[in-house]
């Protein structure tokens, strides 16, 4: 990997997610340089101008400009938010063919620049497109990261916090699997202050597993609800992307639920899925393999199989 004294993030795609991500980066002063690249040059230029005008209010100034793929050469992270959007009633997997075509061209342009950093993928279906980026780029698998279930996990912790009247930061619970309809909650490892969720239910009759099952459905279907109401989701995922970016650039070794390549972990292989992983300056340091109960293992296996069925016709063995 290329080592520079100045951190640079290249953003591909200045749509709602990309622009919100850029806004989050500047507000938290996560990177020293941000270059915005979009087919619509005027949109990228406008975003760069708008963000620069607010730099005086940020903790530290971030050099921000609109650029071209050649600017990816010196980037530490390229975050791809470009692609076709999910429409009302459309699943994330419905976007596969459209976005695979788009991604092949984007990744080839980025690699032609001499880029040798870390890819961060946000475009849906994120697990499929993260795998595609790995295949198209030829970079090591640990340097290709998808947003995975980081937002689902955030939604999960928020709703659990509301239910138990506890700050979400003190709720420890994960959503794993596909970022989509087959994702699953890991109830067997969910706790608040070291007390398991199942134990809390036993102690207090006002809490029920039926309520929590409904809570998970609200987590899983949150995107559909938001899309129906406002057309797209972008603030939450942008903040999740900013969190991953911070973990990488600061070499945090933080555990985040991101889409990463499985090579035997969780009983599956040759697929990118959302699982807890240690994230640092080199990308994915290691996967945190939770001990799942039998029901969770079966659900995870089903989620993996759904993704593999989508991948199979598009990435045949060479």
Swiss-Prot record:
It comes from the Bacteria. SUPFAM superfamilies: LDH C-terminal domain-like (SSF56327), NAD(P)-binding Rossmann-fold domains (SSF51735). Beta-D-fructose 1,6-bisphosphate binds at residues 157, 172. GO terms for molecular function: L-lactate dehydrogenase activity. GO terms for biological process: glycolytic process; lactate metabolic process. NAD(+) binds at residues 17, 38, 43, 69, 83-84, 122-124, 147. InterPro entries: L-lactate/malate_DH, L-lactate_DH, L-lactate_DH_AS, Lactate/malate_DH_C, Lactate/malate_DH_N, Lactate_DH/Glyco_Ohase_4_C, NAD(P)-bd_dom_sf. Allosterically activated by fructose 1,6-bisphosphate (FBP). It is an enzyme of class 1 (oxidoreductase). Its EC number is 1.1.1.27. Homotetramer. Catalyzes the conversion of lactate to pyruvate. Belongs to the LDH/MDH superfamily. LDH family. This is L-lactate dehydrogenase 1. It comes from Peribacillus psychrosaccharolyticus.
């Amino acid at each position: 990997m290329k080592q520079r004294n100045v951190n640079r993030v290249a953003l591909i795609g200045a749509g709602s997610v990309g622009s919100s991500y850029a806004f989050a980066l500047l507000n938290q002063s996560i990177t020293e340089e941000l270059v915005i690249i979009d087919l619509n040059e005027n949109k990228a230029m406008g975003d760069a101008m708008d963000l620069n005008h607010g730099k005086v209010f940020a903790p530290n100034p971030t050099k921000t400009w609109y650029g071209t793929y050649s600017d990816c050469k010196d980037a530490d992270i390229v975050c791809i938010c470009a692609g076709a959007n999910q429409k009302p009633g459309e699943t994330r997997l419905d976007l596969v063919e459209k976005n695979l075509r788009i991604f092949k061209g984007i990744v080839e342009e980025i690699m032609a620049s001499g880029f040798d950093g870390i890819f961060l993928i946000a475009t849906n279906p994120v697990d499929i497109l993260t795998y595609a980026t790995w295949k198209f780029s030829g970079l090591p698998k640990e340097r290709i990261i998808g947003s995975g279930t980081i937002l689902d996990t955030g939604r999960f912790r928020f709703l659990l916090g509301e239910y138990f009247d506890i700050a979400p930061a003190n709720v420890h619970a994960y959503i794993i699997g596909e970022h989509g309809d087959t994702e699953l909650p890991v109830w067997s490892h969910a706790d608040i202050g070291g007390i398991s969720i199942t134990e809390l239910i036993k102690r207090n009759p006002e809490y029920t597993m039926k309520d929590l099952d409904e809570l998970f459905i609200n987590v899983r279907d949150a995107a559909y609800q938001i899309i129906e109401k406002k057309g797209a989701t972008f603030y939450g995922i942008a903040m999740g992307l900013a969190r991953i970016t911070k973990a990488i650039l600061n070499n945090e070794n933080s555990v985040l639920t991101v889409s990463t390549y499985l090579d035997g972990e969780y009983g599956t292989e040759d697929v990118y899925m959302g699982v807890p992983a240690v994230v640092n300056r080199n990308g994915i340091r290691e996967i945190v393999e939770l001990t799942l109960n039998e029901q969770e293992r079966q659900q995870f296996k089903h989620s993996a199989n759904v993704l593999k069925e989508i991948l199979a016709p598009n990435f045949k063995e060479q």
